[in-house]
């Protein structure tokens, strides 16, 4: 395997290179003076135990069969129960590509920067959790193995009809993960799971109960990344003022600059309006809209950014009920602020960062401070338009107006005042491409049509791709919206869309993205599918 770059949702990047017995992760952001790179190493290998039948065929004990290269075999005879002797073979081989349930991983070593450059993490357990999360983030971005399982009961079943199983990886209690009570802490954080859910009889974490831990693909993508991602705090923090990152904090705010041969002028080094306040208040500060284009900050401003360098996970609002128009429903949390990015993720198939931010009423363009992909963005001139100008240009296109109607100046001011919904702008590397609405189904007209079938925390989406160059990526941004809905509140069980019945293109994209068609619904203004 060749080295590859992993782009994290918060903008951090790591170079992953194969090393002896596993892979090395080197940070591209934690620059320091030492020669030894900052990062860690993981050991990944494949363990397989097979039953050899009398006819020479094999079946995996844990339900997976793969073509085997040469490796270490250990054969033992077992009784099949009908008097016929069978052999079990256990094989450990180097990791080549992911298997369905036979891969094993542990963190073998960790290299941290000097404490003279970066302060120690506030919690060593949090640091190990982030390292394991990043390692799993890389692993579950590999090519997914075949879902078919070859078990003892199905060894004569055709391959296309064999049962399917979860994609998961075993986490071995070894190396860095041998720390006292570390595995139980990671399990309580939701990062690890075990099928041994009894109390047990051991008084510590040294028994087999804590040695059989695993992470499945399904559970990993349901974990909020904000729970694990953070950055180390520099001993000398970078300045939020553009152009002055190399100046000491206690230097004068202005330096004399020669202009001609007769006089000196003071070059202003004051911060750009809003940037310093943004750094001081995050997370939670409103995004400034009076910053000139092209100004960059020291760190990408994402939902993961915090000046305290701690994880930015916030639990959902506790359950309490209220009434709206004689409808009883849970009290909803306030959505993010206008212009605030609430979702960010790198999409490898596109090679760009997908972001969603709340639409803004500002007459000025909303600046983008989020992470950027490795290539220059498409159509950067769109970032110079305000949200109102973007919507007006998108509504003017016949394919959009056919389903959304004509644009009016009151459209966006009306939507931002809705209590059960908020508008969003989708971006590829900071360039706007579409308009979306995220709403609570129960208080929406959809909830009224469904009657009592709408769940308390079901979400709904209205979608519109305004730019022609961004079409054809529906599966990527659709799964991003669903991912945000499911991770921001784990009580959300359903994400609904009700496109018009003649919108064949979006119906096709929904089928390809994993949505299921429930039924047709009759609204006062349309027939939906």
UniProtKB/Swiss-Prot annotation:
Its domain of life reads: Eukaryota
User: Which Enzyme Commission number(s) are on file for it?
Assistant: 2.3.1.-
Q: Which InterPro entries match?
A: Acyl_CoA_acyltransferase
GO CC aspect terms: cytosol
Where along this sequence does the record place binding of substrate? 462
Record: active site: 498 (proton acceptor)
Q: Where is this region: Disordered?
A: 59-95, 239-258
Q: Which GO terms describe its molecular function?
A: N-acyltransferase activity
Query: Where can this protein be found?
Result: Cytoplasm, Cytosol
The UniProt similarity line reads: Belongs to the lysine N-acyltransferase mbtK family.
Q: Return the PANTHER family for the record.
A: LYSINE N-ACYLTRANSFERASE C17G9.06C-RELATED (PTHR31438:SF1)
The entry's function note states: Acyltransferase; part of the gene cluster that mediates the biosynthesis of at least 11 siderophores, including beauverichelin A, dimerumic acid (DA), Na-dimethyl coprogen (NADC), eleutherazine B, ferricrocin (FC), fusarinine A, fusarinine C (FsC), metachelin A, mevalonolactone, rhodotorulic acid (RA) and tenellin. This cocktail of siderophores for iron metabolism is essential for virulence, and more specifically for the fungal virulence in penetrating through the host cuticle. Siderophore synthesis is also involved in conidial germination under iron-deficient conditions.
- Name listed for the protein in its UniProt record: N5-hydroxyornithine acetylase sidL
Lineage at the top is: Eukaryota, Fungi, Dikarya, Ascomycota, Pezizomycotina
UniProt gene name: SIDL
């Amino acid at each position: 395997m060749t080295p590859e770059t992993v782009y994290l949702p918060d903008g951090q990047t790591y170079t992953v290179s194969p090393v002896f017995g596993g892979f090395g992760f080197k940070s591209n952001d934690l620059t320091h003076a030492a020669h030894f790179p900052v990062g860690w190493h993981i050991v990944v290998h494949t363990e397989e135990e097979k039953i050899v039948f009398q006819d020479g065929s094999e079946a995996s004990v844990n339900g997976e069969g793969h073509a085997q290269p040469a490796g270490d075999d250990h054969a033992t005879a077992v009784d099949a129960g009908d008097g016929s002797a069978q052999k079990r073979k256990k094989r450990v081989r180097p990791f080549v590509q992911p298997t369905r349930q036979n891969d094993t991983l542990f963190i073998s070593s960790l290299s941290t920067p000097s404490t003279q450059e970066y302060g120690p993490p506030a919690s060593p357990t949090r640091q190990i959790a982030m390292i394991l999360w990043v390692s799993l983030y890389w692993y579950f971005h590999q090519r997914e193995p075949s879902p078919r399982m070859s078990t003892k009961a199905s060894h004569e079943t055709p391959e296309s009809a064999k049962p399917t199983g979860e994609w998961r990886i075993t986490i071995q209690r070894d190396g860095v993960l041998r720390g006292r009570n570390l595995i139980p802490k990671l399990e309580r954080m939701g990062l690890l799971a075990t099928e041994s859910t009894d109390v047990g009889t051991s008084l510590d974490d040294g028994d087999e109960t804590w040695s059989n831990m695993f992470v499945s693909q399904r559970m990993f993508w349901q974990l909020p990344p904000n729970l694990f991602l953070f950055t180390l705090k520099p001993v000398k923090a970078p300045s939020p003022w553009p152009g002055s990152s190399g100046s000491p904090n206690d230097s004068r705010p202005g330096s004399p600059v020669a202009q001609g041969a007769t006089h000196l002028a003071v070059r202003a080094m004051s911060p750009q309006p809003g940037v310093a306040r943004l750094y001081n208040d995050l997370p939670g500060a409103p995004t400034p809209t009076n910053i000139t284009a092209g100004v960059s900050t020291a760190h990408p401003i994402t939902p993961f950014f915090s000046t305290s360098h701690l994880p930015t996970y916030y639990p959902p609002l506790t359950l309490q009920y209220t009434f709206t128009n004689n409808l009883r429903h849970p009290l909803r949390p306030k959505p993010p602020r206008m212009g605030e990015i609430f979702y960010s993720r790198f999409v490898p198939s596109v090679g760009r960062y997908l972001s969603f931010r709340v639409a803004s009423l500002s007459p000025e363009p909303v600046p983008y401070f989020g992470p950027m992909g490795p290539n220059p963005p498409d159509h950067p001139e769109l970032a110079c338009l305000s949200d109102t100008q973007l919507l007006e240009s998108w509504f003017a296109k016949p394919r959009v107006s056919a389903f959304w109607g004509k644009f009016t100046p009151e459209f966006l001011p009306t939507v931002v005042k809705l209590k059960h919904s908020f508008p969003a702008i989708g971006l590829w590397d900071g360039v706007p491409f579409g308009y979306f609405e995220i709403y609570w189904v129960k208080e929406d007209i959809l909830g009224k049509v469904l009657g009592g079938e709408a769940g308390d925390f079901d979400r709904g989406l209205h979608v519109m791709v305004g730019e022609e160059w961004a079409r054809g990526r529906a599966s990527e941004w659709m799964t991003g919206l669903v991912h945000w809905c499911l991770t921001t509140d784990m009580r959300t069980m359903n994400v609904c869309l009700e496109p018009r019945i003649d919108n064949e293109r979006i119906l096709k994209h929904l089928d390809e993205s994993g949505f299921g068609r429930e039924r047709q619904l009759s609204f006062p203004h349309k027939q939906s599918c």
